[in-house]
Curated annotation (Swiss-Prot):
Residue positions of the active site: S170
Region of interest (Disordered), residue spans: 1-101
Bias (Basic and acidic residues): 14-29
GO terms assigned for molecular function: protein-L-isoaspartate (D-aspartate) O-methyltransferase activity
Name the UniProt record assigns to this protein: Protein-L-isoaspartate O-methyltransferase
EC category name: transferase
Organism of provenance: Burkholderia pseudomallei (strain 668)
Claim: Methyltransferase is one of the keywords in the record: yes
One annotated Gene Ontology cellular component of this protein: cytoplasm
């Protein structure tokens, strides 16, 4: 280039290259953010991912898979047919080993144990029951089998319990007391029970006497007593559906008669069916008033001796059948 031209154009061609303009405003911010994101992605791709060790799988003999890796075993385990539809039974979650045991079943098993009945017998002995035959019978007969399942927890308490149809099962102490009074240390051949109820007292009597006759006027209770006694396989009890105030003249005389209901007096028919030297035990008195456990002994064909003993409370003695 001539000197004259150089003077007119003082800048060379390379001097005319412009520097790129820096982005301005929001466009600049977005571009900067994009550049930073690309840099992070590039850095992440450059770092190799940590690979989990691969454990070779072994084939099970029957087509399953043995996996040394528990996680993989759980992941690849084949589901049982219908497993998704089946729900855990019994209300407890599967695999929950800390689930509470069946309290009702545990309670029932405890009630059937001999130790529970023995504690009841010890209380009877402490309250004055001394006849070893009566104590052994009370220990042997499972009272909880004669009450409703909902009352089983109270079966060996000294309490009268409802059995339906406005009737009750007598307290163990009263049952033992009446049987001991009726036996009086004698060997009993024939015993008549008035008021079978659920069958418990008849079962106890069957272990003290050779033959037991029992009358129940309420048909559903008569049927229930048969069902209750059947599992015990008691061979010497004869149940009758009928009017207890009439007794069983065809089977008389009886060494002992036990009446499990209270009347204003003892029915004459029952006194006549008592053997000479026999003993009758019955509650006597009004339903709303005082009832007294009464012992009647037949000392001669036309002579009876009466003793009034303990205050008690029984359901009323009624005539007829229902």
């Amino acid at each position: 280039m001539s000197g004259e031209r150089a003077k007119r154009f003082p800048l060379a061609l390379e001097d005319l290259k412009r520097e790129p303009r820096k982005p301005e405003g929001r466009v600049a911010e977005r571009q900067a953010a994009g550049d930073a994101a690309r840099q992070r992605l590039t850095a992440a791709a450059a770092v190799p991912a940590a690979a989990s060790p691969i454990v070779p799988e072994r084939r099970a003999p029957h087509g399953g898979v043995f996996a040394a890796n528990p996680a993989r075993a759980k992941q690849h385990a084949p589901a049982a047919p219908g497993a998704a539809k089946r729900a855990p039974q019994g209300g407890a979650k599967q695999g929950d080993r800390s689930a509470a045991p069946n309290v009702a079943l545990s309670g029932a098993l405890a009630l059937t144990s001999e130790r529970v009945r023995e504690r009841m017998v010890e209380r009877l002995r402490a309250n004055g029951v001394a006849d070893p035959r009566v104590l052994a019978a009370m220990s042997a007969v499972p009272r909880h089998m004669f009450v409703d399942p909902g009352l089983a927890a109270q079966a060996y308490e000294d309490a009268a319990l409802p059995i339906g149809h406005q009737q009750t099962i007598s307290k163990p102490s009263v049952v033992a007391r009446m049987i001991e009074l009726a036996a009086a240390g004698r060997a009993l051949e024939r015993v008549l029970e008035i008021g079978t109820g659920c069958g418990y007292q008849a079962a106890v009597l069957s272990r003290v006497a050779r033959d037991v006759y029992s009358i129940e006027r309420v048909k559903p209770l008569y049927e229930r007593a048969k069902l209750n006694l059947r599992p015990l396989r008691v061979p010497n009890i004869r149940l009758h559906y009928g009017d207890g105030r009439v007794g069983l003249p065809a089977a008389a005389p009886f060494d002992a008669i036990v009446i499990a209901a209270a009347g204003l007096d003892v029915p004459r028919a029952l006194l006549e069916q008592l053997a000479i030297g026999g003993r009758l035990v019955a509650p006597v008195g009004e339903q709303a008033g005082e009832q007294v456990l009464t012992l009647v002994e037949r000392v001669a064909p036309a002579q009876w001796r009466e003793s009034r003993l303990d205050r008690v409370f029984f359901v009323p003695l009624k005539s007829g059948v229902i």
